[in-house]
Amino acid sequence: MDIAELLAFSVKNKASDLHLSSGLPPMIRVDGDVRRINIPALDHKQVQALVYDIMSDKQRRDFEEFLEVDFSFEIPGLARFRVNAFNQNRGSAAVFRTIPSQILTLDELGCPKIFRELIEQPQGLILVTGPTGSGKSTTLAAMVDHVNKNEFGHILTIEDPIEFVHASQKCLINQREVHRDTHGFEAALRSALREDPDYILVGELRDLETIRLALTAAETGHLVFGTLHTSSAAKTIDRIIDVFPAAEKSMVRSMLSESLRAVISQSLMKKTGGGRIAAHEIMVATPAIRNLIREDKVAQMYSSIQTGQATGMQTLDQCMLDLVKKGQVSKAQAWGYAKDKRLFE
C-alpha cells in the first residue's frame, strides 16, 4: 500500500490525522479518537520509505540531520496535508494532518456574527487560541476567506507550513512558508511592514520578537491575525505579557490594550450524532477590557466576559450551554470542558 492510498482511506473516513509508527499498523484519528487500520504493522524501513517518497531532497537532509521535520504537500483532487516526520524508540514515524481543499465559510462553521464585525475593522490584533487540534487554522482560514471575498486589500500570511491555500479573489494574497520562502516568523514580519499589507496572518506567535513585531504591525494600521496555544482569554493575555522582561511589561500592557481587538479561545467538541463542533470563549476589547489589561487586572476578565454578551462576548460555559440546549453537544461532553461543572450536572 502506498502513501496516497493510505491518505485516500484516511480522507474517505473523515479522519483528521493519519499516524504511521514503526512496529505498529497505521492509525487514524476520527472525531477525536485514534483507531487502528486493519492492515499489518509497518517496520522502520516501510515507514521511512512511505515518508521519503513525498519528501524533497532538502526535507530528507533536514530529517536526517535534525531527526524531525515539518512540511506540507498536496494530493490534487484529494486534500493538502501538514506532515511532521520524527524518530521514536522503534524507528521512524509520521503524522499527516488533513487540510481540506475546500475552505469552509464562517457560516458553514457556525461562527457568531461578531467574527465578521471583528474582521471588518481596519486595524488591530485578533488572536485565535486553543490547544493543538482545536481547529484554529480552520477558523483563521474562514476569516481570511471572508476578507478575500469582501474587501480590496493585500493579505500576507506567514505560516509553518502553509496549510489552507487561498486563491486571490477581491484581495491580493501572498502566502509565505517558513524555511522555504523566509528564514523565520521574525524575519518575515520585519519585511512585512515594507510589503504594503492590509492584513497579516502570523501562523504562530512563538517568541518575544514575533509578538513584539505583531503588536507593532497592529499598532501601525494593519489587521493582524495570530494564534497561541492558550486555553482562555485571560491565559492568553498572561502568556503575552510573561514573555517580556520585567522592565518592558508595563509598556507591553499599554500596547496590547490599545491594539487588541479580540481573543477567541476555542475547543473542539464531539457533536451528538457524530462529527465535531467548535465552542468559543470570545473576549472583545471593550474599554473595560482594555482598562483591565492596562492595569494588570487579568483575574477580573472572566466576569467582564460573562456580563458582556451585548458586545458579542461569551464564556466557554455560556457557549456550551447553548450547544447543549440545541442538542448539538451532550451534557457529559460539556462537563469535561466546563469551568463551572454544576451547570452541566
Task: Report each predicted region and the residues it spans.
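Short, flexible helix-loop junctions that flank or precede catalytic/ligand sites
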Residues: 1-345
